[in-house]
Amino acid sequence: PLIADIGGDTSFTFPTRTFVWDLYDQDGNETITDVYYSIDDTCSSCWVRLDGQATSITLSDIEPGRREFFVKCRDIAGSESEIIYFPDSSEQNNAQVWMVKPVKGDVLIVDDYPLDNSNNALAWYNGMMDTLLGEDQYSYWEIGDELPFSSTDVSANLNYFDHVIWYTAYNNTASANDTYNRAEASLVNFIMSGGNLFINPIDFEDTTFTWFPMDSLVTLNPNGRLFTGTVIESPVDTSLNLSISHLIAVKVKGFWPNVLEFDNVQTIYQMPESDGNQTWLGTPTVCSIGQYRVSPIELSGKVVIMTLPLHDGYRPKLQGNGSAIKLFQYLFETEFTQ
């Protein structure tokens, strides 16, 4: 990966990683008889043989720590190619270090907010998980600007865990984009396989979330302002009510789920009835939980979408009626245990 995409010179992965390469032989690629790869060492007994036409390998159960990957090929005459490797110090624009992270716990926090260079939002989420789950009882994944090249790696990263907390940017610029839409197939597969997903997308324009079908959207604040003190009501339990603690200065959405697509769906948070100073009608949903029927006897995992920002990269936004940790406490203690 490019350093510009990952925000540093180190590529962090979990124990699954896919490598892809091109093959070329001037006498024709059909003359390539063997491809070999190795991890960490190029000793004569370290190489693992692949078919001569192999152009990729997905490695799993890689030991945590600093790692290197090597690949070479051999042709029918017994001539070997040069060894190519990752990381490659001659490729100054690419990652210079590859670190494999251990899988900790059954909860994954996904940081899809590359413009938060100080990681204030990640620190806030980590702090909540420290309180709810304990230190070192969860993992986190900083995506940067680009998902892994192979969707296999995206799915593997998710499938190491039972619960995924995926937060996105408070707002984006032309140079930065959320990646969750490109992870759509992996997210759907994760949910349908029994995983639970909480996702907090803010900057979106349509209802085409295959992992959470919506009937319609409404912009709650066409002027781009949602003011401090606004109460976010929970029809589940008023003790879960939240309140805006700092001005939300981006346009945000309310929504109505497409209930026909779910086996069951429930509102967790909604906006209050307008007091005349707001433009919305009724009580638009801003956080909902749904579940799908996978088969006559099996339900999917649960998917929760929250369309108000919990953090803007500087400070939390919904702390005006106690900490927003109570939302995650409710999810982990009630919804994600069923």
What positions do the PLM features span?
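Short hydrophobic segments within beta-strands
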Residues: 110-112, 200, 306
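Low-complexity, disordered linker/stalk regions enriched in Pro/Thr/Ser/Gly
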Residues: 1-102
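Coil residues (strongly favoring Ser/Thr
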Residues: 10, 42, 89, 131, ...
